[in-house]
C-alpha cells in the first residue's frame, strides 16, 4: 500500500458472508480511534439481526452505528471534525450511495465501506461493484466453504436446508440459519423447475 499524502479516499471491504467484513470494518474504525481520529459508523435500517444501533460481527465484536434509511441521510450526521466515515452492509443502500461516498471522499474524509460483492446467486450485488471501481483500496476477504473447507467467495442461501432458487428474492436478511459460505464448486443455485 502506498502512502497517501492527501486526505479523502475510499476503501472497500468485500467478500461472502462469514468472511470477516464487519470484523475488518470494526478493526479499522478502532485503529482510527486509538489514533485520536473521529470516526462515525453507519448501517442501513434493514440490518437489525444483532442490534438496532451497533454494527456487530458474527463473532460478537461491535461498534456503535447510526442506522439510516436512505444514503443521503448520512450527510445529516457528518460534522467537520470527523476524519473517518464507515458504512457497513453497503449493498443494502439505495443507488445514491455511490454519489454519497464520492462526495465524502472528495470533501477529504476517509470512507470505509463493507458489504457483499455478490448476491446469493453469485451475481454482482447492488452498488458494491461500482464502489470497488472507484475505490483507492479494495480488500476482498474469503470465508471457508462449509461444504468442503476450500476458500469460499460465495454466499449460499438455504431454505429448509436446500439451496434457494435463482428467482427467489435477492434481499432476505439472515444469519447462519439462512446462509453459508461456499466455494465456487459447492455453490448451487437451481432454477425453480430444478427444485
Swiss-Prot record:
Q: Which GO terms describe its molecular function?
A: ATP binding; thymidine kinase activity; zinc ion binding
Which keywords fit this entry according to its UniProt record? ATP-binding, Cytoplasm, DNA synthesis, Kinase, Metal-binding, Nucleotide-binding, Transferase, Zinc
The gene is: tdk
Binding site residues for ATP: 15-22, 88-91
Binding positions for Zn(2+) per the UniProt entry? 145, 148, 183, 186
Gene Ontology CC: one annotated term? cytosol
EC id: 2.7.1.21
Sorted alphabetically, which SUPFAM superfamilies does this protein's record hold?
A: Glucocorticoid receptor-like (DNA-binding domain) (SSF57716), P-loop containing nucleoside triphosphate hydrolases (SSF52540)
Protein location: Cytoplasm
Sequence similarity = Belongs to the thymidine kinase family.
Name-wise, this protein is Thymidine kinase
* Protein's UniProt keywords contain Zinc: yes
**Assembly and oligomerization:** Homotetramer.
Q: Which Gene3D superfamilies match?
A: 3.30.60.20, P-loop containing nucleotide triphosphate hydrolases (3.40.50.300)
Amino acid at each position: 500500500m502506498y502512502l497517501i499524502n492527501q486526505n479523502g479516499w475510499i476503501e472497500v471491504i468485500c467478500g461472502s458472508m462469514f468472511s470477516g467484513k464487519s470484523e475488518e470494518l470494526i478493526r479499522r474504525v478502532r485503529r482510527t480511534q486509538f489514533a485520536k481520529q473521529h470516526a462515525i459508523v453507519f448501517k442501513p435500517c434493514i440490518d437489525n439481526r444483532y442490534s438496532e444501533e451497533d454494527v456487530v460481527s458474527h463473532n460478537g465484536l461491535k461498534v456503535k452505528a447510526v442506522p439510516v434509511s436512505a444514503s443521503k441521510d448520512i450527510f445529516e450526521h457528518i460534522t467537520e471534525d470527523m476524519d473517518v466515515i464507515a458504512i457497513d452492509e453497503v449493498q443494502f443502500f439505495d443507488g445514491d450511495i455511490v454519489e454519497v461516498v464520492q462526495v465524502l471522499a472528495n470533501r477529504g474524509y476517509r470512507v470505509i465501506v463493507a458489504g457483499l460483492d455478490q448476491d446469493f446467486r453469485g451475481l454482482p450485488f447492488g452498488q458494491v461493484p461500482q464502489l470497488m471501481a472507484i475505490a483507492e483500496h479494495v480488500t476482498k476477504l474469503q470465508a471457508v466453504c462449509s461444504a468442503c473447507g476450500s476458500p469460499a467467495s460465495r454466499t449460499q442461501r438455504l431454505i429448509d436446508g436446500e439451496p434457494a432458487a435463482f428467482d427467489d428474492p435477492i434481499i432476505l436478511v439472515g444469519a447462519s440459519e439462512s446462509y453459508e459460505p461456499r466455494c465456487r464448486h459447492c455453490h448451487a443455485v437451481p432454477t425453480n423447475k430444478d427444485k
